[in-house]
Amino acid sequence: MRSVLTISVGLLFGLALSSVAHANDHKILGVIAMPRNETNDLTLKIPVCRIVKRIQLTADHGDIELSGASVYFKTARSASQSLNVPSSIKEGQTTGWININSDNDNKRCVSKITFSGHTVNSSDMARLKVIGDD
């Protein structure tokens, strides 16, 4: 009886750990160096086809001003979606989650994310870290 109880407790503990591991599926998709002059072709390519439901942006070094962002999906027609991003992100600040790929019936792989923007208030280039949640 004791061995059955031990096995049951072990299985429950294992299930609890596996559900915690899946609950936080956040991955750093990449980092973009933001130039000091306004640039509209900053591209973060996703080398492996990845379904991403939402992203967060972090200003790792320096302040950033953004004027736009788009996500591109790996499809026959290279579909894209404009994203609502904040106009400025201060150093060390992380945005809230920005939803993408909201069509749950048609799971599309993200191939790249493009940004328009630049570094402000710094002589060094700011770094924009992109975190994805699938």
Swiss-Prot record:
Signal peptide boundaries: 1-23
Origin superkingdom: Bacteria
Keywords, alphabetical: Signal
Pfam family, one: DUF2541
Family per record: Belongs to the UPF0412 family.
NCBIfam families membership: PRK10154.1
Protein's UniProt name: UPF0412 protein YaaI
Organism encoding this protein: Salmonella typhimurium (strain LT2 / SGSC1412 / ATCC 700720)
